[in-house]
């Protein structure tokens, strides 16, 4: 019985591949020379082994580096989260131990100057911290999760920050502008012995829950915190890389916009200092002259006709805004005068009308229509003494008072623009002669301030004017409707009146004049 074919082939291959061991004097090198295919196989095996070891080593190193990077990113995220929570905690401590407790200890106006915007900021910061705390925790969990990145829910710290940045910039910017005045108010309180002692008690209680030591240190925290956001975001951006942070591209945008917002806050403070300096340079006599004459228009025309005007940067848009400011101020004054005149003439008209009808009802007392004329007299009396007074009160509250406040708001912009015109004239002359003075160093910043702030102020002034005109139109409509409702019923009764028995107005007036002359003449003896 023969062996199966597979065993036969294996036996043949073994015999053909075997070398005589007894007579073998070959070394390993000789064997490899005889079988070059072995050399290739062994070299490939060594290469694969070496590459496997190298790849394992590289994978281990990259894993260690990735974990180290993740640890650094998580550390930054935790710092952001914990520092934001601590900051909001300090804001609430300041609210409890200072704002709430001082509300009945200091003047209401001073308390409002110090804490009004601070409390608004505290509310916004609390809402922001709640959302940011959750987003930062989600980002940390996203980094620690070993799932595939495409399967993970992607949080977005940068997107959340960008959505909040406009609101934060607005409230923090307002607070930054008045922060210096807040410090002066607190300094004034410290000079009052009773308030100072009470503040020390507040300090002692606040120190139990916070590391801040007095009210000043609490009130400066918002500005410090807002300026720290770019540092935290940049630190996170530098330590992160694409793929680790879910919104790495948006994170770069958040860094850029937060830096712009911080620069904007610093610029607002510098602008405020420039504006205060400009207002301080305007004396009371100059202000009265400025607000009561067309001196600004004359100065604008003189500056526009100057040959040196081209040396003033951005002079055309600024002069256009200044001209609009002056004309808006004049129009608002004229509007207030026109409304006051209309109220005066309305009161005068109905008072005279009532006086005439009352006198005429006396002349008609012996006629059938006497009672009806008496009703009209009463109705006109109600209009003259009731409806007109209500009209005046409504106009005073809803129209004239807002217009007067708007006119007062024009004071500072008009004074600042007057200072700018003077500096522009001096700047153009010094520019041509290449001689500069120290008081002109702030001129470019003042120009930038007018370029940005005047359009906003003019828009606000237009809105106030529109609201006042609409309110006045509604008050007028209500007044005329009241007159119609009061007069229509009594006047309608005259449609059925027989006027034949009513004496003519000429005969009545003649009789009255004759009687008056007889009473005034001396009696004969």
From Swiss-Prot:
Cross-referenced InterPro entries, in alphabetical order? AH/BAR_dom_sf (IPR027267), DBL_dom_sf (IPR035899), DH_dom (IPR000219), Dynamin-Rho_GEF (IPR051492)
Keyword list, A-Z = Cell cycle, Cell division, Cytoplasm, Guanine-nucleotide releasing factor, Septation
Key word S-adenosyl-L-methionine present in the record?
A: no
GO molecular-function terms, A-Z: guanyl-nucleotide exchange factor activity
Where the record annotates domain DH, the positions are 72-268
Keyword Protein transport carried by entry: no
Q: Which GO terms describe its biological process?
A: division septum assembly; positive regulation of septum digestion after cytokinesis; regulation of protein localization to cell division site involved in cell separation after cytokinesis; vesicle-mediated transport
Where in or outside the cell? Cytoplasm
Q: Looking at the UniProt record for this protein, which Gene Ontology cellular component terms does it annotate, in alphabetical order?
A: cell division site; cytosol; medial cortex septin ring
Please give one Pfam family short name.
Answer: RhoGEF
This chain's function reads: Has a role in the control of cell polarity and cytokinesis. Involved in bipolar growth and septum formation.
Q: What is this protein called?
A: Rho guanine nucleotide exchange factor gef3
């Amino acid at each position: 019985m023969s062996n199966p074919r597979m065993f036969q082939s294996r036996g043949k291959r073994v015999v053909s591949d075997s070398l005589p061991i007894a007579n073998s004097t070959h070394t390993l090198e000789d064997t490899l020379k005889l079988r070059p295919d072995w050399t290739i196989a062994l070299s490939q095996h060594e290469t694969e082994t070496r590459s496997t070891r190298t790849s394992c080593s590289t994978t281990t190193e990259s894993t260690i580096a990735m974990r180290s990077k993740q640890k650094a990113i998580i550390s930054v995220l935790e710092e952001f989260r914990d520092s934001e929570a601590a900051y909001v905690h300090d804001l609430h401590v300041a609210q409890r131990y200072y704002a709430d407790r001082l509300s009945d200890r200091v003047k209401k106006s001073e308390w409002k100057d110090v804490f009004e915007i601070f409390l608004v900021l505290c509310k916004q910061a609390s809402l922001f911290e709640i959302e940011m705390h959750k987003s930062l925790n989600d980002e940390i969990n996203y980094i620690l999760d070993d799932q595939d990145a495409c399967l993970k829910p992607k949080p977005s710290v940068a997107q959340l920050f960008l959505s909040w940045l406009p609101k934060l910039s607005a409230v923090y910017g307002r607070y930054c502008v008045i922060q210096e005045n807040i410090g002066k108010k607190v300094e004034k309180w410290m000079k009052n012995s009773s308030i100072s002692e009470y503040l020390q008690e507040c300090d002692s209680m606040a120190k139990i829950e916070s590391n801040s030591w007095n009210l000043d240190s609490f009130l400066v925290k918002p500005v410090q915190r807002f300026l720290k956001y770019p540092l935290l975001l940049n630190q996170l951006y530098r330590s992160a890389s694409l793929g680790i942070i879910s919104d790495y591209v948006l994170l770069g945008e958040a860094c850029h916009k937060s830096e712009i917002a911080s620069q904007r806050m610093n610029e607002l403070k510098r602008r405020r200092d420039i504006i205060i300096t400009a207002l301080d340079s305007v004396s009371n006599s100059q202000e009265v002259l400025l607000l009561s004459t067309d001196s600004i228009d004359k100065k604008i025309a003189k500056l526009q006709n100057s040959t040196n005007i081209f040396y003033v940067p951005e002079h055309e848009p600024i002069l256009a805004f200044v001209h609009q400011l002056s004309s808006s101020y004049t129009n608002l004054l004229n509007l207030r005068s026109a409304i006051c005149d209309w109220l005066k003439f309305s009161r005068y008209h109905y008072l005279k009308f009532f006086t005439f009808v009352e006198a005429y009802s006396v002349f008609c007392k012996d006629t059938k229509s006497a009672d009806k004329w008496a009703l009209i007299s009463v109705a006109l009396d109600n209009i003259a003494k009731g409806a007109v007074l209500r009209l005046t009160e409504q106009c005073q509250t809803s129209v004239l008072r807002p217009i007067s406040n708007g006119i007062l708001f024009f004071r500072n912009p008009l004074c600042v623009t007057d200072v700018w015109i003077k500096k522009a004239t001096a700047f153009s002359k010094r520019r041509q002669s290449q001689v500069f003075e120290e008081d002109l160093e702030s001129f470019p910043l003042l120009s930038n301030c007018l370029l940005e702030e005047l359009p906003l102020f003019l828009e606000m002034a237009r809105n106030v004017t529109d609201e006042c005109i609409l309110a006045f139109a509604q008050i007028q409509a209500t007044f005329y409707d009241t007159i119609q409702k009061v007069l229509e019923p009594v006047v309608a009764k005259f449609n059925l009146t027989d006027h034949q028995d009513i004496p003519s107005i000429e005969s009545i007036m003649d009789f009255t004049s004759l009687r008056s002359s007889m009473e005034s003449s001396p009696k004969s003896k």
